[in-house]
Amino acid sequence: HHLKIACFTPEQCVYPISVSHPDKRYRDRTVDFFQRHIEAAVCLDCSCMVVSTGFAYLDVDGEDAFKWAADSFSQICRKAESEGVTLALEPFTKYTTHICNEASQLLRLLRTVGSPALKGLGDTDVIATTGVDTFETFIGILGRENLAHVHFVDGNPGGHLVPGDGNLNLDQALHTLEAFDYKGYLGLEILDRRYVMNPEDAMRRALAWYSERIG
């Protein structure tokens, strides 16, 4: 069908993956995990891969966890740079981590690592659930040059729903991306269990929503 992978996403929520874990062996295993998946992305002819800080322990000092994450990403980025793969760092919600879940934290991490291979990812669901940034302020703080990928889904405010099934202002989000001249892909990260038994219908309705607005 001549399909191409727009952005490769290794599993990192179910598996024990975290660059902000206090155990160095755990972090080293995570670095190795991401480095091997960079190789997989290259094999799949995909130049973009999603990464995250993973789950963070709430009783660990935030600055320590930030340093562990920055050091780990510095190692991962060396591999990404050599393979020509851009890493799209996705913030998680405030219920998952306190290391990277808003635009200012994401930008700080990008600047600390300082690699051209490390960029940011904007997720409409995560941004709304965290409740610190609006989609517009998130993109504005991050900067167009640092935005590698977007997860574009609906929610109440969370839920990862088909566009139109939630109450997020996705039309405004599209206008924001237009205003920032975003040229990348929009990823449909549809995760709610209501779609499990009939995923084809969910995809058809999502495509119809996009077709009405993007053509």
Task: Please describe what each predicted stretch is.
Residues 1-4, 85:
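Short acidic, glycine/proline-enriched helix-loop-strand junctions
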Residues 6-8, 49-50, 87, 150, ...:
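Hydrophobic residues within beta-strands of alpha/beta enzymes
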Residues 11-14, 53-57, 91-95, 124-128, ...:
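Active-site-proximal loop/turn and secondary-structure-junction residues that shape catalytic pockets
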Residues 17-119, 129:
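Active-site acidic/histidine proton-transfer and metal-coordination neighborhood
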